[in-house]
């Protein structure tokens, strides 16, 4: 694997969406508009609540982001499912970062709670992912807890985020 660092900028994340950051066969992030972060500010294999890995990332909020026009007209708010998807994206990114290969797929979440919202007036969303477990067998899978904050206030909490890496997704 190439480019294993402890932080990544927007250009790096765009390279990941094209399969060019870690190399052929490693999981890719989605391309814009579904790429839900502008930078990864910290990657660690040993930190986090469980000592199994920590990912910190950020998304800059501007009123012209695509989802504010359609969700909802006259009442713009970032869809909560996009914040949840961002957490899955980061778990998959971590799996590639630690050497896992395959196509990333979200497998589920044990529990998710939304206690706030992301409005066009916000400045920054931060994501915090605490890896609980990485299984590296025939199926590479990550299990993590995550939280989303807007301008420093926690608004989403997810438990048991699951992402798998698949060599063949035809039967998935």
Curated annotation (Swiss-Prot):
Oligomer status and interactors: Homodimer.
EC number in record: 4.2.1.59, 5.3.3.14
Subcellular location(s) per record: Cytoplasm
Domain of life: Bacteria
Gene Ontology MF, one: (3R)-hydroxyacyl-[acyl-carrier-protein] dehydratase activity
HAMAP family membership: FabA
Keyword Repressor: no
Active site annotation, chain numbering: 71
Name assigned to this protein: 3-hydroxydecanoyl-[acyl-carrier-protein] dehydratase
Gene Ontology BP terms: unsaturated fatty acid biosynthetic process
Function statement: Necessary for the introduction of cis unsaturation into fatty acids. Catalyzes the dehydration of (3R)-3-hydroxydecanoyl-ACP to E-(2)-decenoyl-ACP and then its isomerization to Z-(3)-decenoyl-ACP. Can catalyze the dehydratase reaction for beta-hydroxyacyl-ACPs with saturated chain lengths up to 16:0, being most active on intermediate chain length.
Pfam families: FabA
Pathway: Lipid metabolism; fatty acid biosynthesis
GO cellular component, one term: cytoplasm
Leader sequence segment: none
The keyword Hydrolase is annotated on this UniProt entry: no
Keywords on record: Cytoplasm, Fatty acid biosynthesis, Fatty acid metabolism, Isomerase, Lipid biosynthesis, Lipid metabolism, Lyase
Stated family: Belongs to the thioester dehydratase family. FabA subfamily.
């Amino acid at each position: 694997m190439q480019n294993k660092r402890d932080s990544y900028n927007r250009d790096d994340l765009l390279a990941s969406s094209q399969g060019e950051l870690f190399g052929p066969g490693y999981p890719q992030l989605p391309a814009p508009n579904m790429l839900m972060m502008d930078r990864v500010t910290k990657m660690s294999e040993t930190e986090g609540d469980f000592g199994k890995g920590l990912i910190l990332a950020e998304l800059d909020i501007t009123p012209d982001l695509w989802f504010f026009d359609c969700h909802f007209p006259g009442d713009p708010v970032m869809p909560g499912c996009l914040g949840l998807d961002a957490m899955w994206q980061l778990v998959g990114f971590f799996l590639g970062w630690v050497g896992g290969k395959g196509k990333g797929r979200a497998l589920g979440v044990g529990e998710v709670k939304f206690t706030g919202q992301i409005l066009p007036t916000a400045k920054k969303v931060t994501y915090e992912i605490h890896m609980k477990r990485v299984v590296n067998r025939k199926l590479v899978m990550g299990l993590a807890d995550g939280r989303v904050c807007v301008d420093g206030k926690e608004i989403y909490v997810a438990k048991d985020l699951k992402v798998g890496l698949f060599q063949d997704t035809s039967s998935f």
